[in-house]
Amino acid sequence: MKPPLFCMEKLQIAKIIFEKIWSEENMIGSGNYTMCETGNMNCYQFYLEATKQYGDYDAVQHMDLRVKRSQFIDDIESLAAYFSNELGLKRGDVYTIFCPTNVESLVGFYALNKLGVIVSFVHPLLPTEMLREYVESANSKGVMLLDLLSKDHVKTLNDLGVPVLLCRNSDYAAPLKKAAARLGEGVLEAVFPKFKNCESYSSALKKYRKTRVAGVSNNSADIAVYLNGGGTTGKSKTIMLTNKNVNEVPYKTAYIDEIHEPGEEAEIIILPFFHAFGLCLAGHMALCNAGRVIPLMRFDAKLVVKLYKKNNIIALVGIPNMFKKLYHTKGFDGPHLSNTRMMFVGGDDLSPSFLQDFNDMLERNGTSARLRQGYGLTEVCAPCCANTNW
């Protein structure tokens, strides 16, 4: 039996897309910028290669502070030197990032990836017994965590004897706010129990500023990350993704859309990095496309609206409840949405009626973007590369 006509049309469209992707010497893009093919590169190699054509630009942002690509790379290299010289980390080792969505997690991911270290992303609000289980099962060589969330884990990490890298909100605070932030953090840390083996993120960077160490290259088949997902039934599952898996997301998504103004066009990251949706699409994809990423440690609909109005936001990915809250938050519906070109949602279904209402709002504000659905927060990374207006 022949397939229905609409299926034949979609197959033809898929053929055109495939041929387009592999045309022009395997470079995706149009205009002034192109996305390089993934080759055998690891994630950090791919980031460097994909973004070198853009020069220096604002790569990441923490609230009001923007960080240039050159500074971002310098932080990555300095932290890689810390991991190599202080902890002796090497290819195949595992290191745990136990942080909310922040700039330090991105720096840590690329620094560890440079060395060939597998990054185990763990939900930062899990109870300390679960943290112990993940650290022990992966034989993790250390843990990066946020000072504000560290109190309940001091005994566990001291018992395990693993070195701790402590992040603070002040690490990337704007100059006028840094002193006040450090004062408040100092008060809290004074009353918190103490880690036996601890280095602060800022001191690690300062100690190894401008230091460079050799890394691993062309190891695309190596495992890059462990993502500790919840699964649907039974015990939680650990997803292992290779460098190639992670790099294919920005490579394929670049066909759907590419950056027009490096460092000016931005994406607010409202998803965690312990899911591929947050790490690969919201984080790695936006960074490799020279978008300015604005990580938020917790979802705040009013703050998202504020950032939308102050920045040129071109992409947003999230879960259904986030988009529902945004839809009902005063000020989200407005002309600032006209800059948006991509929106993806995963983790659960949205009702057809809500999708219609939300997409009507987007159309009303002059954007061709539509809210596109995926599946789980990890599985959504595959359909996001093909689920377009076609």
Regions found by a protein language model. Name each.
Residues 1-86, 91, 171-196, 212-217:
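N-lobe entry segment of adenylate-forming
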Residues 39, 65, 80-129, 270:
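Conserved AMP-binding/adenylate-forming
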Residues 99, 117-135, 147-150, 291-311, ...:
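ATP-dependent adenylate-forming carboxylate-activation enzymes
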Residues 110-115, 137, 275, 285-288:
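Short hydrophobic alpha-helices that are characteristic scaffold elements of the AMP-binding
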